[in-house]
Protein backbone atom coordinates (compact mmCIF):
# COMPACT_ATOMS: atom_id res chain seq x y z
CA UNK A 1 0.00 0.00 0.00
CA UNK A 2 1.43 3.24 -1.04
CA UNK A 3 1.78 5.86 1.62
CA UNK A 4 -0.38 8.86 1.06
CA UNK A 5 1.77 11.80 0.22
CA UNK A 6 0.82 15.34 0.85
CA UNK A 7 2.12 17.87 -1.75
CA UNK A 8 2.35 21.50 -0.85
CA UNK A 9 3.44 24.21 -3.25
CA UNK A 10 6.53 25.89 -2.04
CA UNK A 11 6.48 29.63 -2.19
CA UNK A 12 9.64 31.21 -3.56
CA UNK A 13 10.47 34.28 -1.55
CA UNK A 14 10.01 37.41 -3.58
CA UNK A 15 13.19 39.15 -4.77
CA UNK A 16 13.89 42.40 -3.15
CA UNK A 17 13.66 45.23 -5.65
CA UNK A 18 17.04 46.22 -7.17
CA UNK A 19 18.35 49.73 -6.93
CA UNK A 20 17.47 50.57 -10.54
CA UNK A 21 18.34 53.93 -12.11
CA UNK A 22 15.64 55.93 -13.67
CA UNK A 23 15.60 55.67 -17.48
CA UNK A 24 16.64 59.28 -18.01
CA UNK A 25 19.78 58.79 -15.91
CA UNK A 26 20.74 55.65 -17.85
CA UNK A 27 20.45 57.48 -21.14
CA UNK A 28 22.51 60.35 -19.78
CA UNK A 29 25.24 57.95 -18.65
CA UNK A 30 25.35 56.24 -22.06
CA UNK A 31 25.59 59.60 -23.79
CA UNK A 32 28.45 60.65 -21.53
CA UNK A 33 30.28 57.37 -22.21
CA UNK A 34 29.89 57.82 -25.97
CA UNK A 35 31.16 61.39 -25.74
CA UNK A 36 34.18 60.27 -23.72
CA UNK A 37 35.04 57.67 -26.36
CA UNK A 38 34.90 60.31 -29.09
CA UNK A 39 37.05 62.70 -27.05
CA UNK A 40 39.59 59.93 -26.48
CA UNK A 41 39.63 59.09 -30.21
CA UNK A 42 40.14 62.74 -31.14
CA UNK A 43 42.98 63.04 -28.61
CA UNK A 44 44.69 59.92 -30.01
CA UNK A 45 44.39 61.21 -33.58
CA UNK A 46 45.68 64.61 -32.51
CA UNK A 47 48.73 63.09 -30.81
CA UNK A 48 49.48 60.87 -33.82
CA UNK A 49 49.02 63.77 -36.25
CA UNK A 50 51.20 66.08 -34.16
CA UNK A 51 53.91 63.44 -34.02
CA UNK A 52 53.79 62.97 -37.78
CA UNK A 53 53.90 66.73 -38.33
CA UNK A 54 56.89 67.18 -36.03
CA UNK A 55 58.69 64.29 -37.71
CA UNK A 56 58.12 65.88 -41.12
CA UNK A 57 59.29 69.27 -39.90
CA UNK A 58 62.37 67.70 -38.35
CA UNK A 59 63.25 65.92 -41.56
CA UNK A 60 62.68 69.04 -43.61
CA UNK A 61 64.77 71.17 -41.28
CA UNK A 62 67.59 68.83 -40.36
CA UNK A 63 67.72 66.25 -43.10
CA UNK A 64 67.11 62.55 -42.75
CA UNK A 65 70.54 61.10 -43.30
CA UNK A 66 70.34 59.26 -39.99
CA UNK A 67 67.32 57.25 -41.19
CA UNK A 68 69.32 55.54 -43.93
CA UNK A 69 71.88 52.83 -43.55
CA UNK A 70 75.11 52.90 -45.54
CA UNK A 71 73.66 50.74 -48.33
CA UNK A 72 70.19 52.24 -48.53
CA UNK A 73 69.49 54.48 -51.50
CA UNK A 74 67.32 57.53 -50.83
CA UNK A 75 64.10 57.98 -52.74
CA UNK A 76 64.43 59.29 -56.32
CA UNK A 77 63.66 62.87 -57.28
CA UNK A 78 60.63 63.24 -59.52
CA UNK A 79 61.32 66.82 -60.63
CA UNK A 80 61.49 67.26 -64.43
CA UNK A 81 65.09 68.53 -64.24
CA UNK A 82 66.44 70.30 -67.31
CA UNK A 83 70.18 70.93 -67.72
CA UNK A 84 71.54 73.53 -70.14
CA UNK A 85 75.24 74.10 -70.74
CA UNK A 86 76.04 77.82 -70.96
CA UNK A 87 79.22 79.46 -72.20
CA UNK A 88 80.96 82.78 -72.34
CA UNK A 89 82.83 83.05 -75.64
CA UNK A 90 85.25 86.00 -75.64
CA UNK A 91 84.65 88.61 -78.28
CA UNK A 92 86.66 87.80 -81.39
CA UNK A 93 86.86 84.06 -80.62
CA UNK A 94 85.04 82.29 -83.45
CA UNK A 95 84.37 78.63 -84.13
CA UNK A 96 83.39 78.70 -87.83
CA UNK A 97 82.88 74.93 -88.15
CA UNK A 98 80.94 74.51 -84.93
CA UNK A 99 77.21 73.86 -84.84
CA UNK A 100 74.77 76.22 -83.14
CA UNK A 101 76.35 77.51 -79.95
CA UNK A 102 75.12 77.19 -76.42
CA UNK A 103 73.28 79.98 -74.59
CA UNK A 104 75.58 82.65 -73.21
CA UNK A 105 76.29 83.01 -69.50
CA UNK A 106 74.78 86.50 -69.46
CA UNK A 107 71.57 85.25 -71.12
CA UNK A 108 71.30 82.49 -68.53
CA UNK A 109 71.92 84.84 -65.60
CA UNK A 110 69.42 87.43 -66.80
CA UNK A 111 66.85 84.69 -67.34
CA UNK A 112 67.34 83.41 -63.80
CA UNK A 113 66.98 86.94 -62.41
CA UNK A 114 63.80 87.55 -64.39
CA UNK A 115 62.27 84.36 -63.00
CA UNK A 116 63.24 84.87 -59.34
CA UNK A 117 60.17 85.13 -57.09
CA UNK A 118 61.18 84.42 -53.50
CA UNK A 119 64.94 83.92 -53.03
CA UNK A 120 68.35 84.21 -54.65
CA UNK A 121 71.52 82.89 -53.01
CA UNK A 122 74.89 83.63 -54.65
CA UNK A 123 78.23 82.15 -53.60
CA UNK A 124 81.06 84.15 -55.15
CA UNK A 125 84.77 84.89 -55.14
CA UNK A 126 84.66 88.65 -55.82
CA UNK A 127 82.45 91.28 -57.52
CA UNK A 128 83.28 93.65 -60.35
CA UNK A 129 80.38 93.69 -62.80
CA UNK A 130 81.22 97.21 -63.97
CA UNK A 131 84.52 98.23 -65.52
CA UNK A 132 85.23 100.90 -62.92
CA UNK A 133 88.13 98.78 -61.68
CA UNK A 134 89.93 99.07 -65.02
CA UNK A 135 89.32 102.82 -65.42
CA UNK A 136 88.43 102.23 -69.06
CA UNK A 137 85.37 102.76 -71.19
CA UNK A 138 85.02 99.21 -72.42
CA UNK A 139 81.74 98.64 -74.32
CA UNK A 140 81.83 94.90 -73.60
CA UNK A 141 81.20 95.67 -69.90
CA UNK A 142 77.56 96.46 -70.69
CA UNK A 143 76.41 92.89 -70.11
CA UNK A 144 77.88 92.83 -66.61
CA UNK A 145 76.40 96.23 -65.82
CA UNK A 146 72.95 95.00 -66.90
CA UNK A 147 73.25 91.97 -64.63
CA UNK A 148 74.05 94.28 -61.72
CA UNK A 149 71.09 96.53 -62.53
CA UNK A 150 68.70 93.58 -62.57
CA UNK A 151 70.13 92.27 -59.31
CA UNK A 152 69.38 95.60 -57.66
CA UNK A 153 65.69 95.30 -58.57
CA UNK A 154 65.06 92.02 -56.75
CA UNK A 155 65.09 92.93 -53.05
CA UNK A 156 62.64 95.85 -53.51
CA UNK A 157 60.26 93.33 -55.15
CA UNK A 158 60.37 91.07 -52.10
CA UNK A 159 63.01 88.60 -53.24
CA UNK A 160 65.34 87.56 -50.40
CA UNK A 161 68.82 88.13 -51.84
CA UNK A 162 71.80 86.67 -49.95
CA UNK A 163 75.40 86.93 -51.13
CA UNK A 164 78.32 85.02 -49.64
CA UNK A 165 81.63 86.39 -50.89
CA UNK A 166 85.26 85.70 -50.06
CA UNK A 167 86.72 88.27 -47.70
CA UNK A 168 89.49 90.03 -49.64
CA UNK A 169 93.01 89.90 -48.26
CA UNK A 170 93.80 93.32 -49.71
CA UNK A 171 92.21 96.26 -51.51
CA UNK A 172 89.41 95.14 -53.80
CA UNK A 173 86.52 96.95 -55.50
CA UNK A 174 83.42 96.97 -53.30
CA UNK A 175 81.13 99.26 -55.33
CA UNK A 176 78.93 96.40 -56.59
CA UNK A 177 78.38 94.97 -53.12
CA UNK A 178 77.66 98.41 -51.67
CA UNK A 179 75.05 99.02 -54.36
CA UNK A 180 73.43 95.66 -53.63
CA UNK A 181 73.41 96.34 -49.89
CA UNK A 182 71.66 99.64 -50.54
CA UNK A 183 69.06 97.83 -52.64
CA UNK A 184 68.21 95.53 -49.71
CA UNK A 185 70.41 92.51 -50.37
CA UNK A 186 72.22 90.78 -47.52
CA UNK A 187 75.98 90.30 -47.85
CA UNK A 188 78.34 88.25 -45.72
CA UNK A 189 82.08 88.01 -46.21
CA UNK A 190 83.59 84.61 -45.48
CA UNK A 191 87.11 84.83 -44.08
CA UNK A 192 88.47 81.63 -45.60
CA UNK A 193 92.03 82.83 -45.03
CA UNK A 194 91.40 82.70 -41.28
CA UNK A 195 89.34 79.50 -41.46
CA UNK A 196 91.38 77.32 -43.85
CA UNK A 197 94.17 79.55 -45.27
CA UNK A 198 92.31 79.65 -48.59
CA UNK A 199 89.60 81.65 -50.36
CA UNK A 200 85.94 81.21 -51.24
CA UNK A 201 86.42 80.28 -54.90
CA UNK A 202 82.90 78.90 -55.42
CA UNK A 203 80.68 80.28 -58.18
CA UNK A 204 77.00 79.33 -58.04
CA UNK A 205 73.50 80.78 -57.85
CA UNK A 206 70.37 79.18 -56.38
CA UNK A 207 67.02 80.71 -57.40
CA UNK A 208 63.83 79.96 -55.43
CA UNK A 209 65.51 76.70 -54.32
CA UNK A 210 64.36 75.36 -57.70
CA UNK A 211 66.89 76.48 -60.34
CA UNK A 212 70.65 77.00 -60.14
CA UNK A 213 73.79 77.96 -62.04
CA UNK A 214 77.18 76.39 -61.27
CA UNK A 215 80.32 76.94 -63.28
CA UNK A 216 83.56 78.80 -63.83
CA UNK A 217 82.24 82.35 -64.27
CA UNK A 218 83.01 84.93 -61.58
CA UNK A 219 80.80 87.93 -60.85
CA UNK A 220 82.97 89.91 -63.23
CA UNK A 221 82.00 91.68 -66.45
CA UNK A 222 85.00 90.05 -68.15
CA UNK A 223 83.51 86.63 -67.37
CA UNK A 224 80.68 87.48 -69.76
CA UNK A 225 82.55 88.91 -72.76
CA UNK A 226 86.34 88.68 -72.38
CA UNK A 227 86.99 85.33 -70.65
CA UNK A 228 86.01 81.88 -71.92
CA UNK A 229 83.72 80.25 -69.33
CA UNK A 230 81.55 77.17 -69.01
CA UNK A 231 78.78 76.32 -66.58
CA UNK A 232 75.49 74.52 -66.27
CA UNK A 233 72.03 75.85 -65.47
CA UNK A 234 69.61 73.39 -63.91
CA UNK A 235 65.95 74.32 -64.24
CA UNK A 236 63.02 72.87 -62.27
CA UNK A 237 65.30 70.68 -60.18
CA UNK A 238 64.39 71.54 -56.60
CA UNK A 239 65.89 68.33 -55.17
CA UNK A 240 69.39 69.29 -56.32
CA UNK A 241 68.80 73.01 -55.76
CA UNK A 242 67.87 72.42 -52.12
CA UNK A 243 70.98 70.29 -51.68
CA UNK A 244 73.12 73.07 -53.17
CA UNK A 245 71.44 75.49 -50.76
CA UNK A 246 72.87 73.41 -47.91
CA UNK A 247 76.37 74.19 -49.19
CA UNK A 248 75.44 77.87 -49.35
CA UNK A 249 74.06 77.73 -45.80
CA UNK A 250 77.47 76.53 -44.61
CA UNK A 251 79.10 79.58 -46.21
CA UNK A 252 76.39 81.82 -44.76
CA UNK A 253 77.04 80.43 -41.29
CA UNK A 254 80.79 80.95 -41.64
CA UNK A 255 80.19 84.52 -42.77
CA UNK A 256 79.01 85.50 -39.30
CA UNK A 257 81.39 87.51 -37.14
CA UNK A 258 83.63 85.32 -35.02
CA UNK A 259 82.47 82.08 -36.61
CA UNK A 260 84.61 78.96 -36.85
CA UNK A 261 84.27 75.62 -38.61
CA UNK A 262 82.36 73.20 -36.35
CA UNK A 263 84.16 70.02 -35.35
CA UNK A 264 80.88 68.29 -36.23
CA UNK A 265 78.40 70.11 -38.43
CA UNK A 266 74.77 70.16 -37.19
CA UNK A 267 72.41 67.80 -39.01
CA UNK A 268 70.81 70.77 -40.74
CA UNK A 269 73.79 70.74 -43.15
CA UNK A 270 73.87 66.96 -43.76
CA UNK A 271 73.04 65.42 -47.11
CA UNK A 272 71.86 62.02 -48.26
CA UNK A 273 73.24 62.48 -51.77
CA UNK A 274 76.86 61.64 -52.48
CA UNK A 275 79.20 59.35 -54.38
CA UNK A 276 77.78 56.25 -52.67
CA UNK A 277 74.11 57.26 -52.90
CA UNK A 278 73.68 59.74 -55.78
CA UNK A 279 70.33 61.32 -56.48
CA UNK A 280 68.19 59.54 -59.05
CA UNK A 281 66.75 62.21 -61.34
CA UNK A 282 65.09 62.57 -64.71
CA UNK A 283 67.44 64.88 -66.60
CA UNK A 284 66.35 66.22 -69.98
CA UNK A 285 63.92 63.34 -70.22
CA UNK A 286 66.36 60.52 -69.44
CA UNK A 287 67.36 58.81 -66.17
CA UNK A 288 70.53 60.09 -64.54
CA UNK A 289 72.45 59.98 -61.27
CA UNK A 290 73.71 63.24 -59.79
CA UNK A 291 75.27 64.69 -56.67
CA UNK A 292 77.14 67.77 -55.48
CA UNK A 293 80.63 67.68 -53.98
CA UNK A 294 82.40 70.33 -51.94
CA UNK A 295 85.88 71.44 -50.87
CA UNK A 296 87.80 71.62 -48.65
CA UNK A 297 87.00 68.56 -46.48
CA UNK A 298 86.38 70.59 -43.27
CA UNK A 299 83.43 72.21 -45.10
CA UNK A 300 81.88 68.80 -45.84
CA UNK A 301 79.16 67.91 -43.30
CA UNK A 302 78.03 64.32 -42.88
CA UNK A 303 77.17 62.71 -46.20
CA UNK A 304 78.90 65.29 -48.41
CA UNK A 305 81.54 63.86 -50.75
CA UNK A 306 84.75 65.94 -50.83
CA UNK A 307 85.50 67.46 -54.22
CA UNK A 308 88.82 65.67 -54.70
CA UNK A 309 87.29 62.27 -53.89
CA UNK A 310 84.52 62.91 -56.42
CA UNK A 311 86.99 63.99 -59.12
CA UNK A 312 89.25 60.97 -58.58
CA UNK A 313 86.26 58.64 -58.66
CA UNK A 314 85.41 59.90 -62.16
CA UNK A 315 89.02 59.37 -63.26
CA UNK A 316 89.24 55.89 -61.71
CA UNK A 317 85.99 54.72 -63.30
CA UNK A 318 86.78 55.87 -66.83
CA UNK A 319 87.33 53.01 -69.27
CA UNK A 320 87.46 54.71 -72.67
CA UNK A 321 88.50 58.37 -72.41
CA UNK A 322 89.07 61.28 -70.03
CA UNK A 323 88.80 64.80 -71.43
CA UNK A 324 89.85 67.65 -69.12
CA UNK A 325 89.60 71.40 -69.73
CA UNK A 326 91.00 73.47 -66.89
CA UNK A 327 92.85 76.76 -66.55
CA UNK A 328 95.67 75.62 -64.26
CA UNK A 329 97.08 72.12 -63.81
CA UNK A 330 99.79 71.66 -61.19
CA UNK A 331 100.54 68.55 -59.10
CA UNK A 332 101.74 70.79 -56.27
CA UNK A 333 100.49 72.78 -53.32
CA UNK A 334 101.43 75.95 -55.19
CA UNK A 335 100.26 78.41 -52.53
CA UNK A 336 101.99 76.64 -49.64
CA UNK A 337 105.41 77.67 -48.41
CA UNK A 338 107.57 75.82 -49.02
CA UNK A 339 105.94 74.29 -52.11
CA UNK A 340 104.90 70.66 -51.77
CA UNK A 341 104.50 67.94 -54.37
CA UNK A 342 100.85 66.84 -54.57
CA UNK A 343 100.39 64.03 -57.10
CA UNK A 344 96.82 62.90 -56.28
CA UNK A 345 95.26 63.83 -59.64
CA UNK A 346 98.47 63.31 -61.61
CA UNK A 347 98.78 59.74 -60.34
CA UNK A 348 95.15 59.03 -61.22
CA UNK A 349 95.59 60.18 -64.82
CA UNK A 350 98.83 58.26 -65.27
CA UNK A 351 97.27 55.12 -63.83
CA UNK A 352 94.23 55.45 -66.09
CA UNK A 353 96.23 55.61 -69.30
CA UNK A 354 99.00 53.16 -68.34
CA UNK A 355 96.99 50.44 -66.57
CA UNK A 356 93.64 50.65 -68.36
CA UNK A 357 94.58 52.13 -71.72
CA UNK A 358 92.27 55.11 -71.24
CA UNK A 359 92.67 57.92 -73.78
CA UNK A 360 93.54 61.07 -71.79
CA UNK A 361 93.34 64.57 -73.26
CA UNK A 362 94.24 67.68 -71.24
CA UNK A 363 93.37 71.14 -72.56
CA UNK A 364 95.19 73.61 -70.33
CA UNK A 365 94.93 77.38 -70.56
CA UNK A 366 97.87 79.55 -71.43
CA UNK A 367 97.98 83.31 -70.95
CA UNK A 368 100.15 86.03 -69.51
CA UNK A 369 99.57 84.89 -65.91
CA UNK A 370 100.24 81.16 -66.32
CA UNK A 371 102.56 79.64 -63.73
CA UNK A 372 105.76 78.82 -65.67
CA UNK A 373 106.40 75.62 -63.70
CA UNK A 374 103.28 74.09 -65.28
CA UNK A 375 105.18 73.40 -68.49
CA UNK A 376 107.53 70.85 -66.91
CA UNK A 377 104.69 68.88 -65.35
CA UNK A 378 102.67 68.93 -68.57
CA UNK A 379 105.67 67.74 -70.57
CA UNK A 380 106.10 64.92 -68.07
CA UNK A 381 102.51 63.79 -68.64
CA UNK A 382 102.81 64.09 -72.40
CA UNK A 383 105.99 61.98 -72.33
CA UNK A 384 103.88 58.95 -71.38
CA UNK A 385 102.59 58.83 -74.95
CA UNK A 386 104.96 56.15 -76.14
CA UNK A 387 104.80 53.11 -78.38
CA UNK A 388 106.43 50.98 -75.68
CA UNK A 389 103.97 51.88 -72.90
CA UNK A 390 100.95 52.09 -75.26
CA UNK A 391 99.77 55.02 -73.16
CA UNK A 392 97.49 57.40 -75.02
CA UNK A 393 97.81 60.81 -73.41
CA UNK A 394 98.04 64.22 -75.05
CA UNK A 395 98.30 67.77 -73.72
CA UNK A 396 97.42 70.97 -75.55
CA UNK A 397 97.43 74.64 -74.59
CA UNK A 398 94.40 76.81 -75.35
CA UNK A 399 95.26 80.42 -76.17
CA UNK A 400 92.58 83.10 -76.51
CA UNK A 401 93.81 85.62 -79.09
CA UNK A 402 93.67 89.33 -78.36
CA UNK A 403 93.92 92.43 -80.49
CA UNK A 404 95.72 95.52 -79.24
CA UNK A 405 92.72 96.92 -77.37
CA UNK A 406 91.75 93.58 -75.85
CA UNK A 407 95.30 92.98 -74.68
CA UNK A 408 95.06 96.11 -72.53
CA UNK A 409 92.15 94.68 -70.49
CA UNK A 410 93.68 93.26 -67.30
CA UNK A 411 93.02 89.63 -66.36
CA UNK A 412 91.15 88.83 -69.55
CA UNK A 413 91.50 86.72 -72.71
CA UNK A 414 91.85 83.31 -71.05
CA UNK A 415 90.09 79.95 -71.11
CA UNK A 416 88.75 79.71 -67.54
CA UNK A 417 86.94 76.33 -67.92
CA UNK A 418 86.99 73.76 -65.09
CA UNK A 419 85.38 70.53 -66.26
CA UNK A 420 85.98 66.90 -67.13
CA UNK A 421 83.97 64.46 -69.23
CA UNK A 422 84.37 60.71 -69.71
CA UNK A 423 82.35 58.08 -71.55
CA UNK A 424 80.38 57.69 -68.33
CA UNK A 425 80.33 60.91 -66.37
CA UNK A 426 80.27 64.69 -66.34
CA UNK A 427 82.21 66.77 -63.81
CA UNK A 428 81.63 70.54 -63.78
CA UNK A 429 83.51 72.39 -61.05
CA UNK A 430 84.70 75.75 -59.82
CA UNK A 431 88.31 74.88 -58.95
CA UNK A 432 91.62 74.84 -60.75
CA UNK A 433 93.45 71.54 -60.63
CA UNK A 434 96.20 72.11 -58.10
CA UNK A 435 96.42 70.98 -54.52
CA UNK A 436 95.38 74.04 -52.52
CA UNK A 437 92.07 74.27 -54.37
CA UNK A 438 91.05 70.94 -52.85
CA UNK A 439 92.72 71.16 -49.43
CA UNK A 440 92.14 74.79 -48.39
CA UNK A 441 89.92 76.62 -50.87
CA UNK A 442 86.12 76.48 -50.99
CA UNK A 443 84.77 75.03 -54.22
CA UNK A 444 81.81 73.04 -55.49
CA UNK A 445 81.24 70.56 -58.29
CA UNK A 446 78.28 68.86 -59.95
CA UNK A 447 78.67 65.24 -60.99
CA UNK A 448 76.25 63.55 -63.37
CA UNK A 449 76.23 60.02 -64.76
CA UNK A 450 73.92 59.57 -67.74
CA UNK A 451 73.75 57.01 -70.53
CA UNK A 452 72.78 57.60 -74.13
CA UNK A 453 73.46 60.25 -76.72
CA UNK A 454 72.08 63.75 -76.61
CA UNK A 455 72.41 64.11 -72.86
CA UNK A 456 74.48 66.51 -70.80
CA UNK A 457 77.53 64.25 -71.02
CA UNK A 458 77.57 64.02 -74.81
CA UNK A 459 77.01 67.78 -75.14
CA UNK A 460 80.01 68.48 -72.94
CA UNK A 461 82.09 66.00 -74.92
CA UNK A 462 81.17 67.87 -78.11
CA UNK A 463 82.27 71.19 -76.58
CA UNK A 464 85.62 69.71 -75.57
CA UNK A 465 86.26 68.26 -79.04
CA UNK A 466 85.27 71.58 -80.65
CA UNK A 467 87.90 73.36 -78.57
CA UNK A 468 90.50 70.61 -78.92
CA UNK A 469 90.31 70.64 -82.71
CA UNK A 470 90.15 74.44 -82.97
CA UNK A 471 93.00 76.67 -84.17
CA UNK A 472 93.25 78.05 -80.62
CA UNK A 473 94.66 74.76 -79.26
CA UNK A 474 98.42 74.29 -79.57
CA UNK A 475 100.80 71.42 -78.95
CA UNK A 476 103.45 71.90 -76.29
CA UNK A 477 106.18 72.11 -78.94
CA UNK A 478 104.46 74.94 -80.83
CA UNK A 479 106.68 77.93 -81.54
CA UNK A 480 105.95 80.84 -79.23
CA UNK A 481 106.17 83.22 -82.18
CA UNK A 482 103.05 81.67 -83.69
CA UNK A 483 100.83 82.74 -80.78
CA UNK A 484 102.41 86.07 -79.91
CA UNK A 485 103.06 87.14 -76.33
CA UNK A 486 99.79 85.80 -74.96
CA UNK A 487 101.23 82.51 -73.63
CA UNK A 488 103.98 82.05 -71.04
CA UNK A 489 104.26 78.26 -71.48
CA UNK A 490 105.62 78.12 -75.05
Curated annotation (Swiss-Prot):
Segments on the Lumenal side according to the record's topology features: 60-490
GO cellular component: early endosome membrane; endoplasmic reticulum membrane; extracellular exosome; Golgi membrane; late endosome membrane; lysosomal lumen; lysosomal membrane
Domain PLD phosphodiesterase: 196-223, 411-437
Taxonomic superkingdom: Eukaryota
Effect listed in the UniProt record for changing residue 203 to A: Loss of (S,S)-BMP synthase activity. No effect on protein expression or localization to lysosomes
Site-annotated residues for Cleavage: 71-72
Ranges per topology, Cytoplasmic: 1-38
Mutagenesis / variant outcome for changing residue 201 to N: Decreases RNA binding. Almost complete loss of RNA binding
GO terms assigned for molecular function: phospholipase D activity; single-stranded DNA 5'-3' DNA exonuclease activity
Keywords: Disease variant, Disulfide bond, Endoplasmic reticulum, Endosome, Exonuclease, Glycoprotein, Golgi apparatus, Hydrolase, Immunity, Inflammatory response, Lipid metabolism, Lysosome, Membrane, Neurodegeneration, Nuclease, Phospholipid metabolism, Repeat, Signal-anchor, Spinocerebellar ataxia, Transmembrane, Transmembrane helix, Ubl conjugation
Consequence recorded when altering residue 416 to A: Loss of (S,S)-BMP synthase activity. No effect on protein expression or localization to lysosomes
Family from the record: Belongs to the phospholipase D family.
Subunit structure: Homodimer. Interacts with APP.
Role description: 5'->3' exonuclease that hydrolyzes the phosphodiester bond of single-stranded DNA (ssDNA) and RNA molecules to form nucleoside 3'-monophosphates and 5'-end 5'-hydroxy deoxyribonucleotide/ribonucleotide fragments. Partially redundant with PLD4, can cleave all four nucleotides displaying higher efficiency for ssDNA and RNA fragments initiated with uridine and guanosine residues and lower efficiency for cytidine-initiated substrates.
Protein name: 5'-3' exonuclease PLD3
Organism field: Homo sapiens
Originating gene: PLD3
